């Protein structure tokens, strides 16, 4: 909103397999959105969004169908439901499991980018023999700062705001933007390619 004053932001939702659905945000800037519309049905099973569409593709070439016997597609998006509105929490493949406690990277990313001197951030899980996974944050800075100061500042800012297991165990300062060639935010194994 700061970069484009006067612009109304609205979420949209679509998948290659079913197309783009009509969407309505609860209010400007809200993360809660109502999706579906004519030709689309949605349901939530175990906090996962399932979609059925008249416009759905037939399937993948030489691969099993992504649809169940009734034509429903598991999107693998984890959502919360509030009346007719849903809020996307993340993908089930992004869940980080720290000693049995689960978190979505987006929660930690949103806190990190709200901090001073943090231009951008990504968060991922990294395998750990003791905890299963640990939280790893990669940040881009606005201005140069020592790694020691950044780590101390981030941990201090997050302490008390989130549970201890959500605080990044490793913090990496990246020299380049964290987007791939398709301008999507890099995650998981993509992050191994980011120069630090």
Stretches with model-predicted labels:
Residues 10-17, 34-37, 124, 172:
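Beta-strand->loop->alpha-helix junctions that form or flank phosphate-binding loops
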Residues 14, 53, 76-166:
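AMP-binding/adenylate-forming catalytic core of the ANL superfamily
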Residues 45, 75, 80, 179-180:
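Hydrophobic alpha-helical segments, especially N-terminal targeting/anchoring helices
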Residues 7, 40, 118-119, 169:
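A structural micro-motif
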Residues 184-196:
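Phosphopantetheine-dependent thiolation modules in NRPS/PKS and related acyl-activating systems
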Residues 35-39, 43-70, 101-103:
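Conserved ATP/PPi-binding loop(s) of AMP-dependent carboxylate-activating enzymes
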Residues 160-184:
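AMP-binding/adenylate-forming catalytic domain of the ANL superfamily
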Residues 1-29, 41:
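Gly/Ser/Thr-rich phosphate-binding loop
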């Amino acid at each position: 909103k700061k970069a484009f004053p006067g612009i109304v932001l609205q979420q949209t939702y679509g998948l290659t397999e079913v197309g783009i659905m009509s969407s309505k945000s609860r209010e400007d800037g809200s993360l809660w959105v109502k999706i579906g519309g004519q030709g689309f049905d949605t349901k939530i099973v175990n906090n996962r969004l399932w979609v059925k569409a008249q416009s759905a593709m037939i399937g993948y070439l030489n691969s099993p169908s992504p649809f169940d016997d009734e034509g429903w597609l598991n999107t693998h998006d984890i959502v919360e439901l509030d009346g007719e509105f849903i809020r996307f929490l993340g993908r089930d493949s992004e869940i980080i499991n720290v000693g049995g406690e689960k978190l979505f990277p987006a929660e930690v990313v949103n806190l990190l980018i709200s901090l001073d001197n943090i231009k951008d951030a990504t968060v991922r899980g990294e395998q750990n023999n003791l905890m299963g996974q640990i939280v790893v944050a990669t940040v881009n800075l606005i201005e140069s700062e020592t790694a020691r100061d950044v780590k101390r500042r981030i941990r201090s800012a997050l302490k008390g705001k989130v549970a201890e297991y959500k605080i990044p165990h490793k913090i990496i300062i990246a020299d380049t933007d964290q987007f791939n060639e398709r301008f999507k935010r890099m995650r998981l194994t993509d992050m191994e390619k980011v120069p630090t």
